């Protein structure tokens, strides 16, 4: 960053004390305080992994991503703050040590001369705190909501999962991973929107949804995947109504996929290069209902490996068979199936951050990961990944009561209101439990 840019940053500099969150990352923290918060997070991660599906090994690369929502994106690694797209060094320090605290959205650095510096993100911006002042990084001043999830057994893990969703919101819209995907996917976008509806962040994707005009995202080799039709209608329902111009186009596409079966009319076509009539029809019905449109379709009684991926409703319309539940390369499949059945057998990453990933996807540009670390590009492994983060978040956020009390059935608020790509403010927002308050924001 040149001198002119840093002059602009200096104009945004503010005294440190008035803007600090009560218990967030600060350059004034003693090293033991930062280590204590990191230890609490790690203890929570251990419990989480024991209760759910353990871990999968991710590369031993310590980094943290800054730039949630529409903000400019940055990578922190080893005393350097990098532009996440170009790899250009924005700031660097000669450090003796650093502590990355993912649930606090921050990093505390100690320099060779004993100065403590913090890079921290909050509901207002990304800040660099040093020498008693903090400066908002240019391009990051945009509001968003960061619930603390206080009272939830896994409040820290939920904060990190939420961050992994928010950091992948781009000017183009919500993407699975901003390094390897330049365009939004309707399926991943719909799952992200379900999570953002819980946390009051739908405004971050509102303009993207309002601007949708195509019934399909055509991201899988240009294919017209019929599950997109229901996903598109559901997305529209979150910010508009049946008069949105995309709705008529979606309805006009339905006849080409319709078939008649013993249970009635349903749709079928190829999603992820295979037919998934149960999954596709469930999404269609979900989208129609979300917009209050007539529904003349019935979920067919057919075996469908994707049936259990749709856990939001119509659970009784399911024929047992072989589920598509790859928990290694496409862990969002396993998490969705676990949500459907109420099982707990899907993993998160073995590192502090990131917790989610996807590997060997056919449409991902893995070469773009070299800016993060060449090992991610070599392994064709993108992390974090929003479908994985959304499935995990939506299962966990309402699966457990606050500390103590009886376990309740999952109550994720995913009922409407009225996939893999493989060739097969400084004050944080409070978070009332979802079983007590149906929707946030």
Question: Model-predicted segments: where are they?
Answer:
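Bacterial N-terminal signal peptides that target proteins for export
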Residues: 1-7
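Glycine- and aromatic-rich loop/turn segments at beta-sheet edges
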Residues: 158-180, 207-226, 254-277, 296-335, ...
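Low-complexity, Ser/Thr/Pro/Gly-enriched N-terminal "stalk/linker" regions
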Residues: 24-184
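Non-catalytic carbohydrate-binding regions of carbohydrate-active enzymes
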Residues: 25-62, 68, 300-418, 422, ...
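Aromatic-rich carbohydrate-recognition surfaces in CAZymes
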Residues: 183-190, 196-294
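Bacterial N-terminal signal peptides
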Residues: 8-18
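Well-ordered alpha-helical scaffold segments within catalytic/enzyme domains
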Residues: 138-148, 182, 188-201, 231-245, ...
